[in-house]
Amino acid sequence: MTEQWTPEKANDWYASIDPIRGCNYLPRSAVNSTEMWQAESFDPDTIAEELAWAGAAGFNAVRVFHQFLVWRSDPAGLKRRIDRFLDIAAGEGIKAMFILFDDCAFAGKEPYLGKQDDPIPYTHNSGWTPSPGLTRVADHSVWPALKDYVLDIVGSFADDDRVQIWDLYNEPGNSELGETSLPLVEAAFAWAREAGAQQPLTTSIFRGHEGYAMEQRILELSDVSSFHHYGDTGVEAVIQRCQAYGRPVLCTEWLRRVVGQTVELILPIFARERIGWYNWGLVAGRTQTYLDWRREFNTPDSKTWQHDIFHADGSPYDEAEIELIRAFAFD
């Protein structure tokens, strides 16, 4: 059992690590977290190739999603695959932030095991499913299994320095769940602390306005504060809101070139405000997150990528971005 970190402990930890230069990561061969982690589609060779590109580009962290159903069907096998992944990442000087729950559901369906749907042409992230699934979030009959999932995964890697941070719940309340997700958020923090996590815990705010009560509670629960931002303006206001809690601040999702939120725009702000970060996406692949969220903007002639850093052959989308990532340091 561990307690919430004090702001002093969190800030001492943050001062002891290098500035986080991270990305949200799935291999190009995976359409979602189920395909990434299932035994039949786990792809360590592609992971090794891509994380080598990441390390060479200056990345030192990855944010990675997990899927409850994969754990439920094969807990021992999943933990072996996690260990393999962490070894590959560590070999490139990269640490992991792991996500256990997620309310994003681009696919419009609940998670499922087995072969995953192929991506829909010209559609951003068409195969993405939530974890544990939108219908399970408020179904307390499932919660004993959800608790076991958190206790097992967090407990198995609770003092593993290859895991840098636990991001317990991605965008709680998304997919029109709203405040329905808050009890599971609170439970996830309690379970992770019961599991004895030695790493800091967080969940990111993503709506970015003061009136959303659940986000205040999330910031109160977190050891380090974190947020998502995809606009070309307004990031400083969200940073200030997080800084009010006196803890380190991370931006765990950003980069939307199609509306002007670029590497060139954002990294100087993060350097000045001492914000560790994880842009969305590394290699263009089956998630198709290089495409715009707005399907009507995606045509064969589309040139500007929304997310992602590398083409599938390892060549960068923009070499100038790589230079900025490599050079990133706090002011």
What are these regions (language model features)?
Residues V235-P248:
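A contiguous binding-surface segment within folded domains or other stable secondary-structure elements
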